[in-house]
Amino acid sequence: MRTYALVVLLLAQLTTASQNCSLTLSGKVIDLHDGSLLSGATLVVSETETIVQTSLDGVYSIPNLCPNTSYSIKVLHSSCTPKTFSLKISGDSVRDFKLEHHLEELNEIILEGKAYENKTTTVLEKNLNQETLEQYSAGTLGDALNSLSGVSSLNKGNGIVKPIINGLHSSRIIMINNGVRMQDQEWGKEHAPNIDVNSVGRLTLVKSASALQYGGDAMGGIIIAEGPKVAIKDSLYGKTMLFGASNGRGGGITSQLTKSFENGIYGTAQGTFKRFGDVEAADYVMSNTGLYEKDMSLRIGLNRFNYGIEGYYSYFNTDIGILRSSHAHGAADQIRAIESDIPLTIREFTYDIGYPKQNVTHQLSRIKAFKNLGDYTLEIQYDYQLNRRFEYDIRVGNDRDKPALDLKLDTHTILIDLNGSFEDLNFKSGIMGRFQTNFANPETGIRRLIPDYDKYDFGLYTVLDKKINDKFEIETGVRFDYSYMDVFKFYKNSIWEERGYDILFPDLVIEEFSNQVLVNPELEFKNLSATLGFNYKIDDNNTLFINHALSSRAPNPAELFSDGLHHSIARIEVGDLRFKSEVGNKTSLTYSHVGKTFNFSINPFVNNIRDFIVIEPVEIRETIRGNFQVWEYRQTDAQLLGVDIDASFSINEKINLNHQLSIVKGYDNTLNEPLINMPPVNTKNEISYQNKKLQNLKISLQSEYVFAQNEFPNNNFEVYLPITETYEEVDISSTPDAYHLLNLNASMDFKTSKKSSLSVGLGINNLLNTSYRNYLNLLRFYSDDMGRNFLLNLKLNY
């Protein structure tokens, strides 16, 4: 028996010795939620003590494994929760391991796939992180976006800053707020985005319509505001910021608190309060330009390994005064205001916000969920938005405190998306349904600018990106959108006949009155959008992006139906019921170099838009309320082209140089003349110093030079002056002179305890108190822009 046992043991040893332990286990380490590759992951084989790491492409290979043997493999990554996998192999095998980012938050998982991932692969995106955004706590989202090349803004006083991307704005830009496309009467040039900059963790700018998951009508681009990331671990943290400004003699406070648990439950509460009085130009007070703002947001959710759900709510409310001198109702007063070097009305500084003014409230509610289905992720979202806009004119008598414009916009949206990947192919596909209703309150006693309407939208998209090899990646996508509008509108008989609608659309009339008709247009728009592009990695430092985007945009309600006085900008606007969808073809090329000391990117583009809708001044019209400029919408074929350049150079580890240059030109190909309101050439140069050993001291000096816009259409017209019984030309076409501004910023960080720190920031905008006027400021006819402004920021992290 003893001899038998020895023989068996010997045979077993011989079998083991002869066993082929040369098998290989290979595969990828990928993110659970979106299949993105995780480079730098470590795999430890417990039985053999073998340790390997994934490559830049997330690929691993474990050699010298034995057949029919069980192994325990621990997979670790710096941004993920470690996980151990058990498996047995019988031959060379391929196995992918999935990890979950412990810094993932549901907000990014659902729509973007993972925290702060690229929204498109063939367009170079620009980003602003939370540290940069905090410098604009006293300002607006538009102020922050202005720091990016290719972005400028339409301004109207303090707090109304509307982004322009490569020359386009309003309905041609998509604004995404925490996964929700904003619906906030964005058609108005003086309707700023209703988003609190202090609620944003990161801003992403896509200067193209290539990110089709958000919409196909982003001819200018897409701005994506994302909330701060939430760590999936037991923690409680927050921040409170106090900010103040000398110009406007005001300030505010913003605070945010986040609680998270290791089981995936988390919640965040955030709020902001701002109060500013009249701002001042270099030499005088800009009367009635105060601001009063109250914002808050709440977020609560559950983020588990393969499913999650989140609820989000935000409230935005602002009162914004509009420069008193901009509302000059008489023809002679308008000419005098335009020709004067100073505003016609200059009063003592005050915090009171009188008329004219805007009061806007925007509420957003959203619930979304995701479920991981292996190689796919299913995402469902519902959101509701309520926008209330009141615009007040200077009225007398019993109507003094009654708004001249009272709009209520309700929007319901459902999104269903499916994301997945097959080896080197990633896809996104989804459908969208939206119902919107607009109510223009007739109790204002003034003819409604835009009518009541119900609007139905349906969208369907698919986007694919394929990695051909280590250097070449291609992206393509297509989207179809259908819109239906059911509108009820009153037209004066004279307007209905003057525009030829009585001949073109006689069937639209449902009721006739003595001096007006009630019509019921039912409009349909079918739009196709697409994108095709690629990026080519020349080497580790140089990348080339090429993208062509076909975008289609249905006319917005203002462009179709405007027929009255727009009180916020004191002008009559006239739309056209005959408008068709705009169709844009934008080709952009970007070369990017990222090195140790020198970074550079250049982005030329050309955008040809068929049936481009433009609004221009045509005359001054006398009404019972005074004389007002008349601006009419019309369609034409247009071309926009330009280039954006960014460069930075590190002289040493403490001193850096930064440069930006943006050029955009716009032309009306039908009339062979420049387009109105195109941003002038501008350039920014900055030198910055940072000493991490000296309380992280940062000092920067920025030079901003804006050239005069020398290409503009001639929209001047003559007006009759009854007092002198003469005609005089109104020059509203000439552009302001070039100007140069200096801005200084400094900050330091102090450790106040083991778990808290204090950051102190000081800034001076318009350091030399320069008097200037910006071509894109709607108040440039009546006043200079803001003078010197001292800014103080105190931030406590805890």
Indicate where each model-derived feature is located.
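Outer membrane beta-barrel strand-and-loop segments of large Gram-negative receptors
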Residues: 402-417, 459, 574-581, 586, ...
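Short, acidic, small-residue-rich periplasmic hinge/interaction motif at the N-terminus
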Residues: 30, 41-44, 74-80, 90-134, ...
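Short acidic/polar hinge/loop motifs at secondary-structure boundaries
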Residues: 63, 180-208
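C-terminal beta-signal and adjacent terminal beta-strands/loops
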Residues: 552, 609-611, 615, 657, ...
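N-terminal periplasmic accessory domains that precede
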Residues: 94-98, 141-144, 161-164, 176, ...
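Gram-negative outer-membrane beta-barrel transporters
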Residues: 605-609, 618, 626-715
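Flexible loop and strand-edge segments within Gram-negative outer membrane beta-barrel domains
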Residues: 276, 282, 287, 308-367, ...
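Outer-membrane beta-barrel translocator/receptor signature
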Residues: 199-201, 212-283, 288-296, 304-307, ...
